[in-house]
Amino acid sequence: MPVRIPDHLPAAGVLESENIFVMSETRAANQDIRPMKVLILNLMPNKIETETQLLRLLGNTPLQVDVDLLRIHDKESKHTSIDHMNTFYRDFEDVRHKNYDGLIITGAPLGQIDFEDVVYWDHIREIIDWSQEHVTSVLFLCWAAHAGLYHLYGLNRKILQQKRSGVFVHRRTCQHFPLLRGFDDEFFAPHSRFAEMDVEDIRQHPQLQVLAQSDEAGAYLVLSRNNRNLFVMGHPEYQKSTLNDEYHRDLAQGLNPNVPQNYYRNNDPEAEAIARWHSHGSLLVSNWLNYYVYQLTPYDLSDMTAMTPWESRQETLP
């Protein structure tokens, strides 16, 4: 089923060329289908690239998805035109009165800055707090996952001496969660960050559970026990070239970055990059949208109290 996006959004042409089913708002208005309403808070510098990556995953699910794009209202985007932002993005004041089936909060290039020192931290906290009452399920990616664990559960992160960049093997640590349905016992996922959360700190928290982790990259999938918040420590949305682009950007800035691990053939940055994570990245978002959004969200979004209790759904999910 299609992902519904604003007319003329630049990502549309890219996705259509990849045979991803997208639908304009005009066309979707003529269909009598209750789409899943998903809000995306895009904190990444290249807004259009990130939009395309996330819409690619949402467009590969069997559900019709109606997407709104959200920005921090007083933060200027240095890498995306103001015309694009004003045309396709909403401010929080435009949506705070609404309810959504899902919210995705992206990563951000803020890995070495204390959360409290992030200039728009108060806005992030406000949106996270709002989401707990107005959204069925929240998907936090990379930096946002760390920020969410810190704000909601009081867990802090450790700053790494070197950026963790590359594609790492992960293993399932739980066997019977719908989120992991169809996953192999081991799978790949990309990481690009300057910090990490301690796996044992997460395990010891009574409201959290670790569903997948890596010996090299640590915790990857963390789910709150009320099934409302999913924290993904990596970047399942990344396209094949993203780590390469980041590596060469850092080289150009004189940062002397490490070569992304397990990414280039024979770990040679002059060789071809190999994408090993796309199938599981797609499956992750599809399972989240199906089992943790679609099957739990109320038909009438104005009444979030009508959300189906998770316990009653487990009996029907083998």
UniProtKB/Swiss-Prot annotation:
CDD domains: GATase1_HTS. One of its GO terms (cellular component) is cytoplasm. Substrate binds at residues 163, 192, 249. Its EC number is 2.3.1.46. The active site is at residues 142, 235, 237. The record marks 192 as: Important for substrate specificity. GO terms for biological process: L-methionine biosynthetic process from homoserine via O-succinyl-L-homoserine and cystathionine. Belongs to the MetA family. This is Homoserine O-succinyltransferase. The lineage of its organism: Bacteria, Pseudomonadati, Pseudomonadota, Gammaproteobacteria, Alteromonadales.
